Amino acid sequence: MTQNDSMAELKQQALVDINEAQNERELQDVKVKYLGKKGSVSGLMKNMKDLPNEEKPAYGQKVNELRQTIQKELDEKQELLKNEKLNQQLAEETIDVTLPSRQISIGSKHPLTRTVEEIEDLFLGLGYEIVDGYEVEQDYYNFEALNLPKSHPARDMQDSFYITDEILMRTHTSPVQARTMEKRNGQGPVKIICPGKVYRRDSDDATHSHQFTQIEGLVVDKNIKMSDLKGTLELVAKKLFGADREIRLRPSYFPFTEPSVEVDVSCFKCKGKGCNVCKHTGWIEILGAGMVHPNVLEMAGFDSNEYSGFAFGMGPDRIAMLKYGIEDIRYFYTNDVRFLEQFKAVEDRGEA
């Protein structure tokens, strides 16, 4: 029997064995039998040493062609077996369409989103306009347009994330107020709130975060008085914390308002008697406010002899912490589903 006859017979037998394989395990045995390290095709290569040098290239080529042919048939058979196995599984599996489906888990609003929307709805009802602004802001609008020139010592009050010498992540939403007044070309009235994220170089802990949410409000018109500000803040406190709440104003300092005040609300937990929430003072600080500084009005193009206004700023993070008894601001930003799921129950009870 010649070498060609031997290869042809080996090929024919390999094709028969491949065709008769009933599963992937049997097919693997066939592969080892012919193409394995000690397989029949590998054995043919050992015969090459007995051939004359001029016959070795042609012989080696034929052996490789045989190997490739067998490998191709193995691959096709393996694909066929996989398809047959899949079809069998599909035929055996049945789905009872009458069974109830799995309950879909429906999410709920994030507590900060809920708080921001509650505050927005309150001010929309008072005729305010909601205005958005840039989170990446110019130094001028973040500071100088708000009566904070480069030499002003109050700039040390806020460590900022600067991108360039003139561009930074805004440290408050007040730049939106400055830009809005500038666009009005000195014509009132202006009645807006500006919700959004702000950024400061604070070390994250239970009460501080490098990123947090702020809502600021601004009213500019003729004959706006401190009493208008006080009445607005009283309404906000009662809507957010309960109808029996009272507020008190404490003198403070902000470069963009004069006079400036810190606003406290009577403690909703102890009713002013003193507890751990109010640190036994009976009062809880909720926001800062004041009458718009004449310099801010003038830089925005308003005549400070004709127009006056008030501004206030609050942190929805702090308000949400107070309302829901949350002790760590970091819970808002860590995406812990166990924490967030609790507010689904609040929503279901209609307390949203």
Curated annotation (Swiss-Prot):
EC number, as in UniProt: 6.1.1.20
Magnesium keyword on record: yes
One Gene Ontology cellular component: cytoplasm
Record organism: Staphylococcus haemolyticus (strain JCSC1435)
Catalytic activity field: tRNA(Phe) + L-phenylalanine + ATP = L-phenylalanyl-tRNA(Phe) + AMP + diphosphate + H(+)
Subunit note: Tetramer of two alpha and two beta subunits.
Cofactor note text: Binds 2 magnesium ions per tetramer.
Protein name: Phenylalanine--tRNA ligase alpha subunit
Keywords: Aminoacyl-tRNA synthetase, ATP-binding, Cytoplasm, Ligase, Magnesium, Metal-binding, Nucleotide-binding, Protein biosynthesis
Cofactor names: Mg(2+)
Family to which the UniProt record says this protein belongs: Belongs to the class-II aminoacyl-tRNA synthetase family. Phe-tRNA synthetase alpha subunit type 1 subfamily.
Location in or out of the cell: Cytoplasm
